[in-house]
Amino acid sequence: MEPTQTINLIALSLIVVVHAGVLALRLGISLGRN
């Protein structure tokens, strides 16, 4: 694999993880308020 492909994969996975974390946080906050 080319280095650029590896970097792109790492960046994509990081973005996915961050999005999942933000969604989980929002869900937890909204559930906690109810």
Curated annotation (Swiss-Prot):
Localized where? Cellular thylakoid membrane
Tell me the Gene Ontology biological-process terms attached to this UniProt entry. Answer: photosynthesis
What is the name of this protein? Photosystem I reaction center subunit XII
Q: Which residues cross the membrane?
A: 9-29
Q: Provide the family line.
A: Belongs to the PsaM family.
Which Gene Ontology cellular component terms are annotated? photosystem I; plasma membrane-derived thylakoid membrane
Q: Which NCBIfam families match?
A: PS_I_psaM
**Alphabetical UniProt keywords:** Membrane, Photosynthesis, Photosystem I, Thylakoid, Transmembrane, Transmembrane helix
**Membrane topology summary:** Single-pass membrane protein
